[in-house]
Amino acid sequence: MWSEKGGLVKMSEIIQVNGQRFFLRTWGEPKNPVLLLLHGFPEFSGAWEELAPLLSDQVYCVAPDQRGYGQSFRPSDLESYKIHHLVSDVVGILEHIGGSAIVLGHDWGASVAYALAMSHPTMVEKLIIMNGVHPLPFQRALVESPEQIAASQYIHWLRRAGSEQVLVENDFERLRAMFSHGMNMQWLSGEKWDAYRSAWGDVEGVKAMVNWYRATGLYVPKLDEPIEPMPHMEAGEMMIQMPHLLLWGAADTALLPQSYAGLEALAPQLKFASIPDTDHWLHHQKPEAVADIILNWI
């Protein structure tokens, strides 16, 4: 399906990856370097509608609905949402579009992007992360930082049985409140709000999204329980060897600066840039500023 928007050719298509359906949005010309865009919770490939057109003169933007989201396939079992399955999806998508790419991940998409960069480094030419976390610094923050522990308590609520039912009630009132807590959500209104509601669909759609939290082995201490020791993680196996850009909206209330502390020891080619007056949703709030930094870096 082809459409014109602001002089830009945009395409959407359905592909098969490992025998499963994936929905892709693309912007720009396939002859350009590929930029794979991985959304987080609770978004979908339409999350890039503001940013991708600003990049597409120089890169070919490819954005999938990830497993369990939007129009892509939605497994019902929890095992299917473990990180190695999510990475396998992205490997298949990259093989479909050419084999390697610049990879950009936000939120949960950042977790997949980091895992891909560690397990399949030749497929990631450059790595861009926006308000997302490498597993080692984040797990350390969840053991050592009272502020990050407090900020991450919502994960326990999401992991509860039946949380998806509460999230869909009253036209997704709780879901919208959860990802707007303490942050600027003026961008989520009108047609965009309608698009998000459509992407979430129903209770089964929201359950699939929440299953990403249920399937992860991330240790999040509870506020009323003793903190267990830092789980063993082998730093030598978690290095990010390719050029790495970390973009950050400093007013994020879910992921605090402690969540990326020490990242430079794992990423020798790290560059950090903070976007003023933005929070977790920087790609919606200041897409022009984000695009300028990305284009100057790549």
Enumerate the predicted regions with their spans:
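Conserved HGGG/HGGXW glycine-rich cap/lid loop of the alpha/beta-hydrolase fold
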Residues: T26-R74
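Catalytic histidine-centered segment of alpha/beta-hydrolase-like enzymes
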Residues: T278-P287, A291
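Charged catalytic carboxylate motif
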Residues: A47, D89, A208, A289, ...
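A short acidic, amphipathic alpha-helical/loop segment
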Residues: E50-L51, S259-G262, A289
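Flexible "cap/lid" subdomain of the alpha/beta-hydrolase fold that forms the substrate-access gate
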Residues: Q20-F22, V34, V62, Y69-L104, ...
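Alpha/beta-hydrolase fold catalytic core
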Residues: M1-L35, S56-Y60, G98-S100, P268, ...
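Short, hydrophobic alpha-helix immediately C-terminal to the catalytic nucleophile
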Residues: E49, Y114-M118, A291
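A short, glycine- and basic residue-enriched loop/turn
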Residues: S45, S111, T278-D279
